[in-house]
UniProtKB/Swiss-Prot annotation:
Keyword Transmembrane in record: yes
Transmembrane domains' residue ranges: 9-29
Membrane topology, from the record: Single-pass membrane protein
GO-annotated cellular components: plasma membrane; proton-transporting ATP synthase complex
Predominant location category: membrane
Function: F(1)F(0) ATP synthase produces ATP from ADP in the presence of a proton or sodium gradient. F-type ATPases consist of two structural domains, F(1) containing the extramembraneous catalytic core and F(0) containing the membrane proton channel, linked together by a central stalk and a peripheral stalk. During catalysis, ATP synthesis in the catalytic domain of F(1) is coupled via a rotary mechanism of the central stalk subunits to proton translocation.
Keywords associated with the record: ATP synthesis, Cell membrane, CF(0), Hydrogen ion transport, Ion transport, Membrane, Transmembrane, Transmembrane helix, Transport
Protein name: ATP synthase subunit b
Disulphide bridges, residue numbers: none
Protein's gene: atpF
Keyword Cell membrane set for record: yes
Subcellular localization(s) per the UniProt record: Cell membrane
Amino acid sequence: MKEGKALELFNLSTFVFTIINLLVLYYILKRLLFKPVTKFLEDRENKIKSALEDADKQREEAYSLKAQYEEKLQNAENEGRAIIEKAQKEAEERASEIIKSANKEAESIIEKAKEEAVLEKIKAMHELRAEMSHLIIEAASKVLEKKLPVEDEDLIKEVIEEAGSWNK
């Protein structure tokens, strides 16, 4: 009996029915649950991959933009330095030109003053000679108590000029 009860517990029709139920349940679950869940997981995985790829692209673009901006900044700094250097050079050249011009003008003024001094000296010498000849004539006429003729005055002027040329 014990064997019969064991057989009753193990009934072939129940076993087959249970297997069929399991297969039907598996098919229904596969169709209704496993495929949508698998598709959902695959879609989610694809979205995550896409988001990661987009993030990588954006990071690369950001690095590229950063490099471009740094290059532009460096170029701007270089241009600024070049402009400053050019302005300094131009200022130095202008200052040099102004100094040269001032030196030329000073030399011109000094040269003109020297020429004027020489002319004044010559003028003073002529005036002194004329005055000396006049004084000598007056002194000689007082000594001789008479007025010298014009020819004698010319002779005295010649003597004074010769004496003056010896002192030059």
